[in-house]
């Protein structure tokens, strides 16, 4: 099963966010706030999916307070390149029940 999840280009099934995923979300929070012109008091990663490319894309559902959620895509380059995480996409005005999909 693990090998199926790691196929290049495929998106994994949604999983509960881990401390590592929360750390990834926290690192790109300033990028999202700059793009959306909003400040998020709460920024709690709930679930995530990953996609292996030349590096890894992380699709993360983030609870930002009340009934509000955002979906973000974070690119992590190959470890040996030692580059910072990059926010490459986002969707605002999402709900708890909105499916986390490729966008």
UniProtKB/Swiss-Prot annotation:
A motif (Secondary area of contact) lies at residues 51-55. CDD domains: CY. It comes from the Eukaryota. Keywords: Cytoplasm, Protease inhibitor, Thiol protease inhibitor. One of its GO terms (cellular component) is cytosol. InterPro entries: Cystatin_dom, Cystatin_sf, Prot_inh_cystat_CS, Prot_inh_stefin. It is found in: Cytoplasm. Its main location: cytoplasm. This is an intracellular thiol proteinase inhibitor. This is Cystatin-A5. It comes from Sus scrofa. The lineage of its organism: Eukaryota, Metazoa, Chordata, Craniata, Vertebrata.
